[in-house]
């Protein structure tokens, strides 16, 4: 039995990453290794988009007295993953929006931090749209630049992202850059 060369070793590592659902990381390693059917395997790492809606609901974040809707206006080949965190940093919900569309989730009334990632190629919930520049990630900011937003009991809050025209009655939503690893 001969020794494994570096390309074959990286190919095996990429296979292990793909098996663990780390498709963006696997794709990058397949593209680098140059071994076997690496190009075909790299292409297979791009996953089909899930349906627009809630992907994850943390069972420990119970309640549904407030509603959050996110409207994403974009090109048909671009998608968004929205992550909603409690004030304490616990992931409460994730929502996926493919192309122009809207996703809505119910949450307990409270204060939240909302992050979003945008891209064309989907690598699953764990790695979303991959590293920059392929995926773009941010933390939404509100009012005075605060990263926190209060969702009130018995109210529906709607956030519209990538609006093509100005709406003088809408409150502005800004953003702070977020790294892929912290997303």
Could you describe each region identified by the protein language model?
Residues 100-105:
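Short, surface-exposed beta-strand/beta-hairpin micro-motifs centered on an aromatic residue
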Residues 110-114:
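A short tyrosine-centered beta-strand micro-motif
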Residues 40-88, 92-95, 117-183:
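Primarily secretory-pathway and cell-envelope proteins
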Residues 4-18, 40:
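Alpha-helical tetratricopeptide repeat
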